Structure formats: C-alpha cells, structure tokens
Amino acid sequence: MTARFPSFRLAAIAGLALAVVACSKGGGSEAGANAVINPVLADVVMGQDSAPVTIVEYASLTCPHCRDFWKQEFPRIKAAYIDTGKVKYMLRELPTPPAELAIAASAVARCTGKDHYYDVVDDVYTNYHKMMDSASSASGAVPVLVEIGGRHGLSVDQVAACVRSKAIQDYVSKEIAEKPDFANSTPTVIINGEHVTDTRYDNLVKVIEAKLNPGAAPAPTTEAAGPAPETTPAAAPASTPAAPPAAPPATP
C-alpha cells in the first residue's frame, strides 16, 4: 500500500513555504512559484559505488537519536570504512514528529543536489537544537531552514519551492511505502540487508568486518551487551493523524 501524507501535512507544508517567502526582505515570488529547482529524487550514495558493503539508514532530520548517531558513531564509520572504499552509505527519509519540518529539511537537502546533500544533512544536525527550539516559537523554524539553504547556495525563493515541491513529497512517500516492515523507528540501520539493532560503533565494526570477511569468524550477534541505543518512533500514519502544529504567521 502506498503511504500518503495526510491533507493537514500538505497544508502545513504549504504554510511553511509561505512563511519562507515572508522571510525575504522583498517578499519574494508567490511561495517560490517561479524559482528554478532541480531536486535529487533518488538514493544519494556516500562512498564508492563499488564498495562491497552497503549501509542503509532510515532516518529523520527531526530525530534526536538520528542526530546523535550522525555526530557520535557515524564519523568513525565514515573515516574507517567509507573513505577507504569498503562501505557505501545511503540515508532514506522516515519522517518523525514534527513530520512537516522533517520533510521540509530533507527537501532543502535534496534541492542542493548529490554533491551537497550530506553537507546539508550535517548542517541540519549541527543546528538541530536551534531548529527544534525555533519550531515552537512564533516565527517557527523557517528562518533556520532559510539560513541553512542559503549556506549551500539556495535563495529564499528556492527554499520555498523546495519545501512545497510535490515531487519531493511524492518521493518521500515512495520511500516510506517501500521501507521494510521492521523500519518503524529511527535510526534504523541495515547492513547488506541485515537489520542491526545495536548501532554503537564497536558493534557496527563487528558487523561490517563480518560482511567484508565472510567465513573468517562466526557472525556477531546484533544484540547489545547493554541497553541498545534509543530510537524515535516514525510519524503516525495517515489513518491516525496527530494534531497539526500551528503554522507560523506570515510577516506583514
């Protein structure tokens, strides 16, 4: 069954786009309607395509545990395995509350193209607390998204166009519809098809090494010696929508 965004989410996303334009000193075009964007609508691969091990992470840019994984565990995996050609990595969106903001932040990343996508992901996670704190303020998180987009070459109108892009919304819907059933929280990490529940660095190394050298040693357990890292539940499906957040007011 194809996952669909509830209508209130689409309305909230449209409201975000209007608020983005309101951030422009000149007012901008009608919610970025005339802006030219070329979003990437495919997996963005970090690393060499020929790498023998593939890590897929289902993540959300509003998920605190995803942010912790990206900042604490992932840099060492990148240095040891991705930068050395042994592993390639792909992030797939699985929005968590507030889902509209998660989708909007992902849209900004996708609009910067393959070469800058992960730079924006890192920028969002670097400014995670600022973005999330702003989301509950009167102006909302829109100014933070505009700042992030601007640092990576997007105009205010382009950010607005990205946020309202139906093509991006449809692509994220497709990602959700095609995810494995066990991917119902974030981060969900999959290594060469194996769901790894303990996402701490030492365990990830064991799993990766077992994939790189099959038969060299018994396959490691993916159960944690202690409590497994926490995850964030994915956003509620369309059949059980949560109350939408108040849209940030437009600046007169």
Where are these regions (language model features)?
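Structural alpha/beta surface segment adjacent to cysteine/selenocysteine redox centers
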Residues: 68-150
